[in-house]
């Protein structure tokens, strides 16, 4: 049996030619993904919608759980702090117009508190 035969058998049986390769694992808990999505969507709604407001790019980094925007995670939940502004503000170099700090419950399903939503501090 040669490599070509083994490869053909793997394709026929549906087995991976590479063998047991490590798969992608989610290191960010589902509650944290829910939390970043809820925090981002709450800020968008509070600031007039996507036609006039876009949050800082870190609020779209669900695979890293919010990256630099996640400032605290404890028994009270997830706290995010991030800037926002007119659509395209980070890409075109214009200044942000809004800063939002928001705490989401530990399960990621409810807003505990909008701590701050106003001009950048």
Residue ranges and their predicted role:
Residues 55-104:
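Exposed beta-strand-loop-beta-strand "reactive/processing" segments of non-cytosolic proteins
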Residues 14, 28, 69-71:
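Residues embedded in well-ordered secondary-structure elements
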Residues 95-121:
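A short, surface-exposed interaction/processing loop segment used at functional sites
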Residues 26-62:
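Short, non-transmembrane alpha-helical segments in secretory-pathway proteins
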Residues 1-10:
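Bacterial N-terminal signal peptides that target proteins for export
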Residues 9-18:
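Bacterial N-terminal signal peptides
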């Amino acid at each position: 049996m040669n490599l070509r035969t083994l490869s053909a058998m793997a394709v026929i049986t549906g087995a991976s030619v590479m063998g047991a390769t490590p798969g992608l694992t989610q290191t960010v808990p589902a509650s944290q993904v829910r939390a970043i999505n809820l925090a981002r969507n709450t800020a968008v709604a509070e600031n007039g919608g996507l036609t006039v407001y876009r949050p800082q790019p870190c609020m779209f980094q669900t695979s890293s759980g919010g990256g630099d925007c996640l400032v605290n995670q404890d028994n009270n939940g997830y706290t995010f702090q991030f800037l926002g502004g007119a659509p395209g503000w980070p890409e075109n170099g214009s200044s942000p117009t809004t800063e939002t700090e928001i705490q989401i419950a530990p399960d990621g399903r409810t807003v505990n508190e909008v701590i701050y939503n106003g001009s950048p501090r």
